[in-house]
Amino acid sequence: MLEFPISVLLGCLVAVKAQTTFPNFESDVLNEHNKFRALHVDTAPLTWSDTLATYAQNYADQYDCSGVLTHSDGPYGENLALGYTDTGAVDAWYGEISKYNYSNPGFSESTGHFTQVVWKSTAEIGCGYKYCGTTWNNYIVCSYNPPGNYLGEFAEEVEPLISTVSSSSSSSSSTSTTSDTVSTISSSIMPAVAQGYTTTVSSAASSSSLKSTTINPAKTATLTASSSTVITSSTESVGSSTVSSASSSSVTTSYATSSSTVVSSDATSSTTTTSSVATSSSTTSSDPTSSTAAASSSDPASSSAAASSSASTENAASSSSAISSSSSMVSAPLSSTLTTSTASSRSVTSNSVNSVKFANTTVFSAQTTSSVSASLSSSVAADDIQGSTSKEATSSVSEHTSIVTSATNAAQYATRLGSSSRSSSGAVSSSAVSQSVLNSVIAVNTDVSVTSVSSTAHTTKDTATTSVTASESITSETAQASSSTEKNISNSAATSSSIYSNSASVSGHGVTYAAEYAITSEQSSALATSVPATNCSSIVKTTTLENSSTTTITAITKSTTTLATTANNSTRAATAVTIDPTLDPTDNSASPTDNAKHTSTYGSSSTGASLDSLRTTTSISVSSNTTQLVSTCTSESDYSDSPSFAISTATTTESNLITNTITASCSTDSNFPTSAASSTDETAFTRTISTSCSTLNGASTQTSELTTSPMKTNTVVPASSFPSTTTTCLENDDTAFSSIYTEVNAATIINPGETSSLASDFATSEKPNEPTSVKSTSNEGTSSTTTTYQQTVATLYAKPSSTSLGARTTTGSNGRSTTSQQDGSAMHQPTSSIYTQLKEGTSTTAKLSAYEGAATPLSIFQCNSLAGTIAAFVVAVLFAF
């Protein structure tokens, strides 16, 4: 459905007497519109909008009176006219109804003004005008909101005239000495079907034919009610006496229909019929030779049915019908001799059909037999009036869209019988009414006047049965479509499609129909998250997205060739993402990256044709299913690629001052590769990112030194006599690096009274498990010793197990693992005078050399903060000296 209104045509220019002003312009134009809208079914009156009127008047004021009409192309619907009065323009627009074809509703250049005037959804109007002199007279502009003339909505928005939905009846009567009056009454409310509707009722004595074709055959039938009554009577005369009998009978059937719209997503209804009969008879005679019998019966019946269906949008419809029938007085004056008998037989049959979406049938039959003999007493009996009502209503919940196609335009719209539903429910109700009425005896006394009244009360029995069924089918087959015909008498087609949960059935009888069903199901899931232990952390995430859609199109027309196409498209996409960050930098192998893409397409087509003497039907079924599976795996590994580092400690003595210098260095880069690979049609793309070794807290060097004056003579302590202890605490930072970051450092020697100078002592090593070089330089008047301590891989990179003695491991939401040491743990037993804090948050290495073997409290060396590290360093130096 297009979401823009089609511009309506321009008004025609006619010559009328000029009128320059319209004092009651607003009310006249509004009333003229509403007068015409009131002629159509369910079309509400318009209201005046000052906003629309201002818009229309502004556009009218801009007109150049050139005689050329051009639309404003604004947001509203619009009608233009030139040369008319205010109401004359509306009359001219509505006059296009004579050219509108309700059998083929749609937009036409010759009816665009009319359809905008009566467009059911339009609620507001505003108009303006401009006088263009004696040549063109008045220029009229009317704006409508919401606008009309939308493609695909004409059948629903342009309602037929109320007069076309009417009830018609005809009757005739005749009287003779040998035949009673026979009358036929037919009343119907016709459905709007494409082929029209014809009702013919006939009897022996009279006949009547009723034919009604609605003006809008495209609208779906909402109510069908028809009734026919045939009364026959015969009289037989025996003997030579003369019998005169006159009787009259009339049956009046009236129908009252009403419809209402109920918004409901799923509703079922049952039909109930109630009936009551009151019967009385009386006889009053003052004449011994005459008698009068009067019988009256009333049988009001009411029936209501409500059906609702739920589609992609909620639609519900309910209708109710009230049916009442009555038989008026039957009288027969009798005069006869004792040798003459008169018998009459009457049969009354009434048939009423109500249709609301589905079939509701009410059948009522009554048969009355009476015989009268000319004697001192006569009797009239009417027994066993029985009626039964059975009704069946089904409702379904479905998701579907109907599309009508016809190559020959034989039938643009059709009646659809059947339903397509994911789940369906039905309600069946039946009721039976049994009546026994009118059992009266009339006594006539020839000698005296006798009045006798006798009546029998009616009996009514109602039975009701209701059953509700629900069904649901789940299959994984592709859609199939088939169609068949039988000698142009009936058309039937069955369409089933199922991807996930759906079943559909469409059938028709003698009509053309078309339907389209589209079902889409989506499923997504996220699965499998695991974290392996020991030296690495792995996270696996799998996301699966499955999309499947089924489209079924079935079309059958009255043309000689019918094309039915079924398409089944199913797409499935699965995406798997694997992230495997490895904590061990010595493991230089990246996790494998798996990529896969699989696309499979399969389909089948078949063509079948059947030929008979009346019609040829060709059925073509095409089924295709496409499945696409795309899997992408991304693996990430975090480690440091062969970092080399060294830590050296130098002790220099000069002028009775001892300078202790510790230097941390990092001589090579540490790589952080991240590989992301994907494959499309067996072509892989890989990107690797390398990151260099980080600096120490953002600085290029880091040096810790302390110069003190000893209490004794200068002494150079050999480096080999220094015992050493290495303690490493590992933590995960935001980048998940696990290596120890150090940098080359040039020591600064501070001598009292002298200018500080840079020391040239530093040590490097290419690999963590190789000994670092030792360099020693002697300055003038000074002696120095540099000792480099080797740290092994096992000490530097060991990840404490969560089961180690005294260890405490905490895992946060970011997936990082932090290991800390509790008090009393054997992992921390430092005795040192020098302490170096490396890159905070990554690793902490304490290089401790004991001069005097003094122990330091354990709580200082918990590697928890920089403050604790500095305190440890100061305490260690004080103990050393």
Swiss-Prot record:
Q: What PTM annotation applies here?
A: The GPI-anchor is attached to the protein in the endoplasmic reticulum and serves to target the protein to the cell surface. There, the glucosamine-inositol phospholipid moiety is cleaved off and the GPI-modified mannoprotein is covalently attached via its lipidless GPI glycan remnant to the 1,6-beta-glucan of the outer cell wall layer.
What keywords were assigned to this record? Answer: Cell wall, Glycoprotein, GPI-anchor, Lipid transport, Lipoprotein, Membrane, Secreted, Signal, Transport
Q: Name one GO biological process term.
A: conjugation with cellular fusion
Which InterPro entries does this entry report, sorted A to Z? Allrgn_V5/Tpx1_CS, CAP_dom, CAP_sf, CRISP-related
UniProt lists the family membership as follows:
Belongs to the CRISP family.
Which positions make up the signal peptide?
1-18
- Please report the name of this protein according to its UniProt entry: Cell wall protein PRY3
Write down the membrane topology.
Lipid-anchor; GPI-anchor
| Known glycosylation sites | N101, N360, N488, N535, N547, N569, N625
Q: What induces it?
A: Expressed specifically in daughter cells through activation by the transcription factor ACE2. STE12 represses expression of the full-length transcript and induces expression of the short form. STE12-binding to pheromone response elements (PREs) at positions -175 and -161 prevents SPT15 from binding TATA-box 1 and thus it binds TATA-box 2 at position +385 and directs internal transcription initiation at position +452.
Q: Which organism is it from?
A: Saccharomyces cerevisiae (strain ATCC 204508 / S288c)
At the highest ranks, the source species' classification is:
Eukaryota, Fungi, Dikarya, Ascomycota, Saccharomycotina
